[in-house]
Amino acid sequence: MANREVVVLSAVRSAVGGFGGSLKDMEPSDLGAVVIKEAIARGGVDPKEVSFASVGHCIPTDSRYAYVSRVATINAGMAMDSVAFQVSRLCGSAQQAIVSSAQ
């Protein structure tokens, strides 16, 4: 397997909220899309040029959120053939997403 360069384009996190709090009416994929769009904007690249997104997501509350990272990447403007990798590891989700991407 050829070595591939992993580039951290930028790091952005969502707002911090409590369960059932001010973000309760926002779909997780919509919140994720906002975060991904901002990460891409800070990186200064075209969303269609990003081929892989690693997303940390904590505690999906409904089975329809099983593919939240995929929906979020598409809603953020990434290409349909891009890869969306989702990690759900409670408080360690974001850090595990970075580690797993590097592997």
Model-inferred region functions:
Residues M1-S82:
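Conserved "HGTGT" condensation-loop signature of ketosynthase/thiolase-family condensing enzymes
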Residues S88-Q103:
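Active-site-proximal alpha-helical scaffold in enzymes
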